[in-house]
Amino acid sequence: MPDPRDDDEAATAMPERAFFGRRKGHKLRSHQADLIAELLPRLSFDLGAPAPARLETLFASGIAEVRLEIGFGGGEHLIAEALAHPTTGFIGCEPYVNGMAKILAQIEARELGNIRLFAGDAAELLAWAPPASLARVDLIHPDPWPKRRHWKRRFVQDTSVAAMARVLHEDGEFRFVSDIDDYCAWTLAHLLRSKEFCWTAERACDWQLPFAGYTMTRYGRKAEREGRRAAYLHFRRAAAAPNDRAKAGEL
């Protein structure tokens, strides 16, 4: 089965990284190229420097918590969340140039000050972030890597689940959306075998219906038109055992 994402959503990749393949995208327009050259560096941060004790300090004052969206595509969901939650800081991770250019245009037009961007490997970002520093991680319609020999490239792996558990604070959230049944089953299996996460669904509608206030992405609308139904999986970070909290420096 081919990768179902649109070619223009799976656009030109930034330098090499662990969980993303290279794809050639459309040539950037002049203003988009200017945004990549001028605005992106102002919104990015250097993983070569030590992480701040609190990620809220990456933003202007007034930020109460920080969320991460991994692979934001065209940025529809991330922009809507940033507009709806002005006191929340959002870190958007996206390796493809065209997706980055799209969200930069929206940030500029809407004068949003609560979004920071990272064009590198999400695994490196998770390793850099301090423990218990994120309120939520969103993974919306990720690349399913459908061929068996490519499953190791899927973002959801035991290692990434452990990395998210480390950076999410107690009762923090992980939200996963996909219309690819195999990847949904894969994700559910990985999260259910982790002691650090609890699946919140109590009835079928809890995973069959979008989250409250959820903004559908362009790819999500396309999938619906073509008759593919997405699953909306919601997990919470379980309370850490006392010895785990001690290792994290909380005791």
From Swiss-Prot:
What pathway does the UniProt record associate with this protein? tRNA modification; N(7)-methylguanine-tRNA biosynthesis
Assigned EC number:
2.1.1.33
The record's listing under PROSITE patterns reads: SAM_MT_TRMB
> What is this enzyme's class at the first EC digit?
transferase
One Pfam entry for this protein is: Methyltransf_4
Q: What does this protein do?
A: Catalyzes the formation of N(7)-methylguanine at position 46 (m7G46) in tRNA.
- Supply the alphabetized keyword list: Methyltransferase, S-adenosyl-L-methionine, Transferase, tRNA processing
Record-listed S-adenosyl-L-methionine binding positions: 69, 94, 121, 143
Identify the residues that bind substrate: 147, 179
List the InterPro entries.
SAM-dependent_MTases_sf, tRNA_(Gua-N-7)_MeTrfase_Trmb, tRNA_methyltr_TrmB_bact
Species annotation: Rhodopseudomonas palustris (strain BisB18)
**Which Gene Ontology terms of cellular component type are present?**
tRNA methyltransferase complex
Q: Name one GO molecular function term.
A: tRNA (guanine(46)-N7)-methyltransferase activity
Active site at 143
Q: Quote the protein name from its UniProt record.
A: tRNA (guanine-N(7)-)-methyltransferase
